[in-house]
Amino acid sequence: VLLMSCFFAYRILTFSNSEPMGYLLARLICFVFALLIILQNIKSKVTIWGPTFLAVSYVLIVTFNILIFTQTSINDFTDAALWPLLFLTIYEVTAQNCISEVSLFRILKITKIVCLGYSFVLVIEHILGIIPGTSEMFPTYVLLALVPFSLYEMDMEHGIKFNVIYLICTFLIMLMTSKRSCILVLAVGIMGYFLVKAKIQGRNVKAIVNKMAKYIFAILVIFFAMYFVTKLMKLDIVERLNEMLNGDTNGRSAIWENVLEAFNASTLSKKMIGHGYHAFRFYKYSGYMYILNGNLAHNDYLNTLYDYGIIGVAVYVSFLLSMIKELLLLIKKKSEIAPAFTFSIVLLGFLTFVSYFGIESRIINYVAIFWGYTLAIKRFDIKN
């Protein structure tokens, strides 16, 4: 935790990429932090837990790529290494019972209020065109990434009214921004949440179907209400949903083909260990494809394959699969964590294929904290 504090203090104080020695120090701290976690497990004679090992491995792969490939000079190393370090840190701190759940929920409440306010302002600016080029994308996705914690808090019977309001506001913002993947994640994720919750509570199929029918009806009512509102505001929600249903990927298929062509043209060593952090973003993403208002491949697996090679994508996919395995174990044991955890896996499933998730430490951060916190509680049976 001390090493992490030093690292982020350094990043705050030096917001420039003109200091190579400082960047070397920042990378070295990440490397040492990862090794210390392994040594701690060995010294305490505790079997290294699979996801912990995979998260450490991912940090080491990112560090190796940035140290070796000088062409991938970056202005923010935390983009790559932050989320696995957050997962490791919150897991270790929670496992040692050094965190108060009440304090965590208070911090999350403040975070949600700030993110909601920020997102509403950006969405209004975007709709009215007050500030040209205003991007509401990442505040919107951050709202989505905080949903698993809201569902978990409600299951713990903490702040139910506030979190219901938060979920409603989040859904309205998704409709206003016409983010198709976000709308689908919310719809499918909440359905999955109710289904798993009904299963672990031992309710019958009829009760589940009735619950889902009411939920779908509520969504349709809200959707049609928003449809008439957005017609007046000249938004394109219905048009964008229609494009999605007709298979229009907004140029993504062309980018995916470009990634595969670039990867196939690489040397064997590059295919194995990758081209370096954000190599595709800075060196292969150009021309007409830049209209996608982003710089990545819009597919985590292809992006990771090009940047970190076969080894990197194998570690990344293995970590994500380990989270799916944990969900199945939670459902099998009828854990109260399982319903909220289900939403996080739905989020993973959609965003890794058609948007951003773990390739940058933005959307995934709160999900990584949620995974580390809840899995430490489950693994060590921590109370209060």
Task: Annotate each language-model stretch with its function.
Residues 205-211, 223-258, 282-285:
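Flexible juxtamembrane loops connecting transmembrane helices in multi-pass membrane enzymes
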Residues 48, 148-232, 321, 325, ...:
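Hydrophobic alpha-helical segments of polytopic membrane proteins
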Residues 1-41, 57-70, 83, 121-134, ...:
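N-terminal signal-anchor transmembrane segment
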Residues 42, 307-349:
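Hydrophobic transmembrane alpha-helices and their immediate junctions
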Residues 132, 246-308:
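Long extracytoplasmic/lumenal interhelical loops at the membrane interface
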Residues 146-151, 340-353, 357-384:
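Transmembrane alpha-helices of multi-pass inner-membrane enzymes
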Residues 24-32, 49-63, 71-95, 110, ...:
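Aromatic-anchored transmembrane helix interface
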